[in-house]
Amino acid sequence: MNLPRAERPRSTPQRSLRDSDGEDGKIDVLGEEEDEDEVEDEEEEARQQFLEQSLQPGLQVARWGGVALPREHIEGGGGPSDPSEFGTKFRAPPRSAAASEDARQPAKPPYSYIALITMAILQNPHKRLTLSGICAFISGRFPYYRRKFPAWQNSIRHNLSLNDCFVKIPREPGHPGKGNYWSLDPASQDMFDNGSFLRRRKRFKRHQLTPGAHLPHPFPLPAAHAALHNPHPGPLLGAPAPPQPVPGAYPNTAPGRCPYALLHPHPLRYLLLSAPVYAGAPKKAEGADLATPAPFPCCSPHLVLSLGRRARVWRRHREADASLSALRVLCKGSGERVQGLRRVCPRPRGATATCSSDHQACCIPKPLPLCCKCPPPLLLGQFCSNSSSIRRTAPTAALPPRARCWAGTCRPRRRC
């Protein structure tokens, strides 16, 4: 009679058992495997609860494609059952700060730096601005340039210096401040097509004055002096016309004035020297040129007419731009070299006086050797200053020897 087998605790493993027939029995190990699976499940649940509490309450973190999923998806099989539900509950990772800043940055304006500078200058009532004023206008008008301020400020400075369409205006002494003003060249106002700043016609270049170009005189010339400088001299009875503007000069300049005053190439006042200076002149001054004498205010109409005839004859034998040549005079008594200049005037009809009495302001200079006893005067034309007073004087015989010498009546002892 077989007795019922007492159940042993599962914790103790069953070793080899023998039945009544003496055969070995099978070992029961299923109970141990179930216990191990339960322990692993409990450990995994504890780990998941810990992660859930540390990260976010109510969500179960699982590594499925690197995306956080709700707990019900993990418990239901690990994957989303409904695609629409997955799309609604899916949360994309946050973007970086740089990407968000690029998305909010405004677009760059389609204008060149020259167009931006032109806009800033034209909107000013005085049509001029400093560099800081131009940069302030651009940054206030276009938000794109508010962030990259140092970079485009250097570009503005280079465009102001390298383009001829912008003119630098120095700051006036009575206006304190820093930096010069910048304005537009008046000839560059049409460099944009139809006033649109999007397209420029061509690069503006300021006209350069040629070296041989004659600039207008800074002051109007008298009629007699203009006859000497005119390439086609004629009767000039009235005031000379205002000089024509030179191409490339500023159009806003008033007639008779130029932006930079230039004197005659050889002013007479620099060549009128005293007698000792003439006596001590070096030998290299023998071929030096003398300038055209400065005009004198005493000129009558008939003398101007005769001057035109004499000037035409004079210019046939001389070049238009040639100056007068000096003479070399060797005086026998002193042995010094003296440069002299004699004025020969056209003698009007009925005039009996010599050159000293009829000498006018518009005389044509002509070189003539001087006599040995008569030193040159301190100033040329000192006997020709006033024609009205000289005509009332005595004839040539009553004049002093020096005056008669310069008038041409005395004959030198020996021609040098």
Swiss-Prot record:
SUPFAM superfamilies, per the entry: Winged helix' DNA-binding domain
InterPro entries: Fork_head_dom, FOX_domain-containing, TF_fork_head_CS_1, TF_fork_head_CS_2, WH-like_DNA-bd_sf, WH_DNA-bd_sf
Main localization (coarse): nucleus
GO cellular component term, pick one: chromatin
GO BP annotations listed: anatomical structure morphogenesis; cell differentiation; regulation of transcription by RNA polymerase II
Segments of the chain annotated as binding DNA: 108-202
Keyword Membrane (UniProt): no
S-S bonds: none
Annotated compartments: Nucleus
Repeat recorded as keyword: no
Biased composition (Basic and acidic residues): 1-29
Gene3D superfamilies: Winged helix-like DNA-binding domain superfamily/Winged helix DNA-binding domain
Biased composition (Acidic residues): 30-45
PANTHER family cross-referenced by the UniProt entry: FORKHEAD BOX PROTEIN, FORKHEAD BOX PROTEIN D4-LIKE 3-RELATED
Keywords, alphabetical: DNA-binding, Nucleus, Transcription, Transcription regulation
Protein name from the UniProt record: Forkhead box protein D4-like 5
Gene Ontology molecular-function annotations: DNA-binding transcription factor activity, RNA polymerase II-specific; RNA polymerase II cis-regulatory region sequence-specific DNA binding
Chain intervals for the UniProt region annotation (Disordered): 1-55, 70-105
